[in-house]
């Protein structure tokens, strides 16, 4: 019996695993292959179904904002239309697209786009191609990025918007004209509004941007005397204030534009994302924002007062160490025998980050404040601030949490590791006019990360392997610790 379930003739995306193999209910068929029945894994039982409800006009309660689910719904509907046009299927596109491929493919697009965005963000923070290449490569070959981009959960969507917003924000900070500064600031507001409409954690990204703008102003004008009326006037009207704002904008104009970008636009986008709730009658137009506000309160109460536990829950301080990853899927019945080893086949999918990337990023994150202060390094300061604002908000939360809540912080763990590696790569020994020694360290580090990715690939994709190869401890299988099972 074969030990891989890939069927090139199956659903579109089969070979890259979008629809298959991680579906519940593997069973050997008489033809000695594996049948891929439809099925949800982990929180797909909520988000994929809620997305389908959005298409069908069915009311539901979910404590997360609606935009990410609407994007999943767009994927389901589009795939349903594809089946009608290219397969000759008959029926409602919403129902025809309600398949694993339908609710997963949109996330895969957004997840894939995060990779070049990380390259662009890194290059904008520090115009060093080694830094940018390392950031994109580490993103591409991390297990959490890989998994969350391939399943019907909502987390990849806010991550995409957050990375894009940070990129636009840094483009804005480096603007040279008032026009470019205004355009990029407003675009940043639009994207951060989309991020908040996908998940509330994006509010932390917005807070970090506002903090950076405030620090820029304070640092630039800390020497101004503001204790007198004349000093206050100088803060608001002096020509000396112009350069403090990106693009040379005057401070009063810039503050007004920032209020529009960071308050008005996100509020409008967030409110607009709830229009489907009004359209299907779950909210009533006659009540104005009353139903929406009540829903927000219920969502907050859910997060604040949830007391349920979960066997794969983990405390926030354990996440960087990969103490307790989440098993999204596991199957050990009816998969057959591995022809090479004679072991029973098992299949699983664990939300485990790439250990090489995660563990080596920890000292890099710790080093960032030192580099920021010693070298007055904006990239180091920005990455450190981004990590803290995406990670620490989880600390006071008492409800059950999971490793994937580290997703936002992972952006900056990757950037921290890439930044330190790129710093080490600078000034290497030149041979034939080319610097080799230190860049070799960076390339070797990335190569090991790729090897780790290849090794753990089966437990990120649900490909059946021998049980010892899966469950064996360190040096034997992929589940190195009992807490990983």
Put a short name on every predicted segment.
Residues 10, 15-25, 36-48, 59-74, ...:
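Extracytoplasmic catalytic/substrate-binding loops of multi-pass membrane glycan-assembly enzymes
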Residues 332, 350-376:
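Hydrophobic, aromatic-rich transmembrane alpha-helices
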Residues 5, 10-11, 22, 26, ...:
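Transmembrane helical bundles and short interhelical boundary loops of multi-pass, membrane-embedded
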Residues 84-94, 113, 118-141, 176-183, ...:
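Transmembrane-helix signature of polytopic, membrane-embedded enzymes
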Residues 93, 101, 105-126, 164-168, ...:
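Transmembrane-helix motifs of polytopic, lipid-linked glycan transferases
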Residues 165-184, 214-222:
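Membrane-interface transmembrane helices that cradle and orient dolichyl/undecaprenyl
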Residues 107, 124, 144-157, 198-201:
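Short acidic/glycine- and proline-prone juxtamembrane loop motifs at membrane-interface regions
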Residues 135-140, 147, 167, 192, ...:
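Short helix- or helix-capping micro-motifs
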